[in-house]
Amino acid sequence: ANFEIVNNCPYTVWAAASPGGGRRLDRGQT
């Protein structure tokens, strides 16, 4: 998964790689 995510954002990449905890930074909400 390094083609469409890379085009999105930097936080979206790690968010998608996470099991569910990464969904919290879906919009960059720290």
Curated annotation (Swiss-Prot):
Name the UniProt record assigns to this protein: Thaumatin-like protein
Family (UniProt): Belongs to the thaumatin family.
Sections of the chain in a coiled coil: none
Species in which this protein is naturally found: Phaseolus vulgaris (Kidney bean)
GO BP term, example: killing of cells of another organism
Function: Has antifungal activity against C.comatus, F.oxysporum and P.ostreatus.
Lineage per the UniProt record: Eukaryota, Viridiplantae, Streptophyta, Embryophyta, Tracheophyta
Keyword Protein biosynthesis: no
Domain of life: Eukaryota
Localization, UniProt: Secreted
Disulfide bond listed as a keyword: no
SUPFAM superfamilies: Osmotin, thaumatin-like protein
Predominant localisation class: secreted
Keywords: Antimicrobial, Fungicide, Secreted
GO CC terms of this entry: extracellular region
